[in-house]
Amino acid sequence: EGCDILLNREITSIDMDKLIVFCDKEKINGDLIISTISPDFLYKCCWGELAYVGRDFFKIVLPNEKVLPDDVYFIYYPNENEQQTRITECKKFTLHKSKNSLITMEVPSLKNKLYPTMIQSQLDLAEKYIKNLPEKIMSVGRMGTYRYVDIDDIIMQGLKFKEEL
């Protein structure tokens, strides 16, 4: 209530002093900007680009009612010798019933930006960007804060943030 939420827009630039967002050849003014994008984008990477790790997702349907044990939703493979990093049995999150199981296998990739690299120099750089944001620009979420945060924690952050506004 009292705000416009715009989805699926490509941001081309942001005037942080005037609180203007340019996207899809459109100029959007506001009195507050809540950003979920990487803070280096806001500053056009003036102090350097923040490093992220991505994932490629491979979907596999198996003719089994279940693949993983009942209380296991996903399995991590943190071993350097394993190419994939996680396998997830998707229907366990939705409680969907089926004689087949969809699993996803995640493989490290540089094609997209999903997870911040938890290297001190990168954390320091992110902190520099975030601390220099104008008072009326709030940076939230995994990319906005450059922290590895699970989706349930991000939702709780969003609800808390809404109450603080």
Q: PLM features: what roles do these ranges have?
A:
Residues I5-C23:
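A conserved short coil-to-beta-strand element within the FAD-binding core of flavoproteins
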Residues M16, K27-N29, L133:
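Flexible, charged surface loops at secondary-structure boundaries
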Residues E1, I33, G158:
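PAPS/PAP-binding and catalytic site of the sulfotransferase fold
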Residues K25-K128:
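Mid-domain catalytic core of redox enzymes
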Residues P116-L165:
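C-terminal catalytic lobe of FAD-dependent flavoproteins
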Residues G2-C3, G30-D31, P134:
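Short, well-ordered alpha-helix to beta-strand connector turns
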Residues I5-L7, S35, S139:
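A structural signal for the hydrophobic beta-strands that form the central parallel beta-sheet
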